Structures are given as C-alpha cells and as structure tokens.
Amino acid sequence: MRFRALILSLAACIIALGLSSSSFAQTKADTINKALVKTHATLSKRYNRVSHIDAQALSKMDEDSYIIFDVREKDEFEVSHIENSIWVDPSIDASSFNAQYSDQIGDKTLVLYCSVGVRSSRLAQKLEKTRPETETSPIYNLENGVFGWHNESRPLVSETASTHYVHPYNRLWGRMVNRKNLRRYEPEEK
C-alpha cells in the first residue's frame, strides 16, 4: 500500500509538469528538473537507508573504483544506458544479486540507476538491508536516474554506438525527459 502511495505521489509530480506554465519564470526544462528534484526528495524519504550520488560526482570518480548497474527492463537498457553499466532485472532479489555479482563488485563502490530512481532505490535498499557487516564499500543510487543524466546531456550508449536517445519508460514518466524528440521505445536500427 505504501508503494502505491509513493507511485501516486510521484505521478502527481509528473502531472504537475503539464499544469504548471508560468509564462515568464520557468522554461519547460526548469519545470522538468524541478519534477525530478521533487521525485528524488520523495524517494529519499521512502528509501531512507539509501545513499545517493549525483551525476557530477559520479563523473569525477575513477572508473575503476566503481561498478554501475542499470536496474531497468531489458528493452529500456537496449535503447540506451550509461557506458559500462551492467543490466540487472529490476525484480532480482538481494541474495540472487549478491550471488551473481559479488565477484565482479569486490571492494568497488556500487552505483545503481533506473529511469528516475524508484527501481534502483528499491534494489539499493534491499542490498543495504542484507549486506554483511564486513562489507563496507558504499552503495549509491544515481540521483535522478538516467533521465537526469540524459537531461544534463551526458553520454549514453546503445549496443552498437553512442546515442542521444533514452527510453521514456512510459508516456507519463517520459515527461521528465527534457527533449521529447529524443525519447525512443525501440533501439536504433543497426
């Protein structure tokens, strides 16, 4: 029930995108970014055990010091993803995740992302709850997810090359992507 309340609250933020139109004060991008900030605030309260990292801080980290996981559906990942990210099924449980990826992670910082942070925060919290006390490497959710990354014009890749497209998840959530013409439900043709 609490998850449903979270989704309804986040949907209200998205719907507000279409309703707020101050002719002189806000651009569409400002409105979208404010919706992402509001969504992040809601997620931070809901998943209060999860630490977050923003795109700027992540881009300054040594690439060998972290491992990044994309916690979206496979079709979203195929359209685009952050370079070197590893796809993870959003429904994976913590023990399966640890069994499958613990050797790759080692002592590296773990970064998870999805569209805006719902699915990745959920997985990050599961991992935090079940991790042994001996493991001290940080687990982060990427603040504002791949939508925030994309809105800041940071690089994305597909299976074949770099791309400017991002999967919008659905029409409602996709309204948080600044450039409508760069939303795409299918990967680019090879």
Q: Can you annotate each of these PLM segments?
A:
Residues 9-20:
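Bacterial N-terminal signal peptides
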Residues 1-10:
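Bacterial N-terminal signal peptides that target proteins for export
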Residues 2, 24-51, 78-107, 121-190:
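Rhodanese-like catalytic fold shared by cysteine-dependent sulfurtransferases
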Residues 55-64:
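A short acidic-Thr-Gly-centered motif at the start of a beta-strand
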Residues 67-72:
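Short hydrophobic beta-strand that contains or immediately precedes a catalytic carboxylate
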Residues 115-120:
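Gly/Ser/Thr-rich loops at beta-strand to alpha-helix junctions
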Residues 64-66, 106-109:
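Loop/turn elements at helix/coil->beta-strand transitions in domains of secreted/extracellular proteins
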